[in-house]
Amino acid sequence: MALNQWMHPRNPYKTPPDFKAMAITFSDFRKFVKQDITGKVKLDFSDPAALACLATTLFKKDFDLVVEVPPTGLIPTLPSRLNYLLWVEDLLSTLPKQATESAKVRGLDIGTGATAVYPLLATKHFGWSMVGSEASPESLATAKENVARNKLDGKVPTSV
C-alpha cells in the first residue's frame, strides 16, 4: 500500500489506516494481522490473501461497499486507485463552469478486473457514471456480482 508524500491532499489514506482499530472491528481482517512486541499491529504485505482482505475491509470501512476480492487475481490498492480519481476530479474542476454544470462525468475503465474498483469508487464516492469492460469471463462475472451486490448495477454497466 503506497502511503507517501505523493498522495493527493484529499486522499484519506495520506494518513495510514489504523490496522489495530480495523482488526477490532473486522474479524476477517483480524486473522491476517499480528501484534509485535511494541504493540504495533502489522500486516504481511507479501501474502495475497492478506492483501485481498485488506482491500475488502477498506472497501467496506471507507466506502460502505461489499466487494469480493479474489486473491488469485490482481488485488487493487485502494489508496492509489482513489488517488488517481482525486487527480481526475482536480482536472475536471479546471474546465469552464458552463461545461460542467449540466454535463455528467462519464468514464470508461478498460480492463476493470474482478473488483471493478474504478467504477465502484467513481460511482459511490464521486457520483460519476462509469462503464467497466473486461476480457476475462471469470473477472467479468465477479465484477458484475460486485456491482450488483452494491446495488449499482443500474449505474455501472459491465461488459466484455
Q: Where are the language model's segments positioned?
A:
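S-adenosyl-L-methionine
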Residues: 135-160
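Conserved class I S-adenosyl-L-methionine
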Residues: 100-113, 129-131
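Secondary-structure boundary elements
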Residues: 94, 124-129, 149-155
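Conserved alpha-helix/loop element of class I SAM-dependent methyltransferases that forms part
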Residues: 53, 57-61, 79-106
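Glycine-rich phosphate-binding loop plus the immediately following alpha-helix
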Residues: 125-127, 131, 136-139
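Conserved SAM-binding loop of SAM-dependent methyltransferases across substrates and taxa
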Residues: 114-128
